[in-house]
Amino acid sequence: MNVVFAVKQYISKMIEDSGPGMKVLLMDKETTGIVSMVYTQSEILQKEVYLFERIDSQNREIMKHLKAICFLRPTKENVDSLIQELRRPKYSIYFIYFSNVISKSDVKSLAEADEQEVVAEVQEFYGDYIAVNPHLFSLNILGCCQGRNWDPAQLSRTTQGLTALLLSLKKCPMIRYQLSSEAAKRLGECVKQVISKEYELFEFRRTEVPPLLLILDRCDDAITPLLNQWTYQAMVHELLGINNNRIDLSRVPGISKDLREVVLSAENDEFYANNMYLNFAEIGSNIKNLMEDFQKKRPKEQQKLESIADMKAFVENYPQFKKMSGTVSKHVTVVGELSRLVSERNLLEVSEVEQELACQNDHSSALQNVKRLLQNPKVTEFDAVRLVMLYALHYERHSSNSLPGLIVDLRSKGVAEKYRKLVSAVVEYGGKRVRGSDLFSPKDAVAITKQFLKGLKGVENVYTQHQPFLHETLDHLIKGKLKENLYPYLGPSTLRDRPQDIIVFVIGGATYEEALTVYNLNRTTPGVRIVLGGTTIHNTKSFLEEVLASGLHSRSRESSQATSRSASRR
């Protein structure tokens, strides 16, 4: 179950099927992102694809010497653009691939437009999602719900993305969903409808234990996306932002022109692949080793250019040398900027208190520490408000709750009103009233003992004590202990055996910390394969945008106690 491999296979098959000769790859905005996540431009160039064009680009030239490979989402706009294209074809022959199921009527319209008979084939290749890591995918949708209900357009897109994922992995799953979320049940029903309607597509070889799709809602754990991160990939996303593997470094003081935007992709960057799940401290020493390795290779290459043979050897090694030099400067810059932000924003201290708020239950200590940090001028308004949010979520119903006082402290610190208002919005979004689970207190005697012992001996790393709630959910699922009254099956059948292939989908967005949890479970649990997906991949900033987009913050307390109004059609 490797989503990067699945999408890669589709794209290389498209290119192979078009045969030898020069080609153009014709895409839309979304499929451009889908392709760029798994292939670099230079890799595709090696496959005789010399031009990359957007179907919606108005000024494309006529190039009859090129074959066109079209990879498009089956939207009305794309079908209309293709109809126009086929009426006046710019290329010699067209191989058309849709990233999802296309209706018979659309295929008929395309056939009618193809008067010059330039279409060689029309196929469905189900690469309709963003493959982030081998076990992680996203749909790049921010703001999927209105209140507690789906935005209809986003429900449709999410259903398409999730069914495409199942088809690309050749899985016809049983479905379980989070009972406390109406949105999770609704998505499950939509996926089930597609499976029933397109049953021929889902007729895969039956496995002894059927695969399982588990649909969760971000509302059940609003803590995880609010925490600072200390593993490489998660930390880069939290502090710098990752957008389709691209990192914008243009704001870094004194940045050179060629490093204003860098790409971090485990597919093409060995250092990143080996370090993405390691702690920040380890990254520092690994960067040092990388630099030393680079330094060792560098003088040797330059000293020995005495004979023609030396020069030939250097030229042969140069692409690798140049690539290594690019890798070194990229990671040194990224890690340098992370270090600068950690120090400038006092993040070690901030993160320690965040972890206390997420993992411990000592109210007076937590309150004291939050108040102390709110007085610290180095703590930014963004970090100050996130600490208050974590406090508000954890101690929402504590008898000594001091949230009003902390809001006053935020105002005294000069925190903008838009941030202060977000505190109640986050509680409205993921507070105790809407959670189907208890995020904070240990559930059983074993867990209580573990927490007690942890408290006695201290934790190995104070900055990474927190484990996402997803860890416990998946642990119970793998052991066959996930309660059916909290996570019911959709439909009458239930799974007798422990699941082996699990697809988890989080409405409202997953996080890189959860992706790390899944990576570790895959590594340490033989016979179990888990893939995680979400409407998007959040950092704190995008999560707060998600909360704002839901519109829950704008309701008065009274109306929010009533049932959320139904989603209005946009």
UniProtKB/Swiss-Prot annotation:
Keyword Protein transport found: yes
Xref: SUPFAM superfamilies: Sec1/munc18-like (SM) proteins
Gene Ontology annotations for the cellular component aspect, listed alphabetically: endosome membrane; Golgi apparatus; Golgi membrane; membrane; synaptic vesicle
Domain of life: Eukaryota
One Pfam family from the record: Sec1
Bilayer disposition of the protein: Peripheral membrane protein
Cellular compartment(s): Golgi apparatus membrane; Endosome membrane
Tissue localization of expression: Ubiquitous; expression was highest in testis and in brain. Detected in every part of the brain.
Modified residues (Phosphoserine): S307, S441
GO biological process: intracellular protein transport; vesicle-mediated transport
Key words, A-Z: Endosome, Golgi apparatus, Membrane, Phosphoprotein, Protein transport, Transport
Protein family per UniProt: Belongs to the STXBP/unc-18/SEC1 family.
Function of the protein: May play a role in vesicle-mediated protein trafficking from the Golgi stack through the trans-Golgi network.
Subunit structure: Interacts with STX6 and ZFYVE20.
Protein name as it appears in the record: Vacuolar protein sorting-associated protein 45
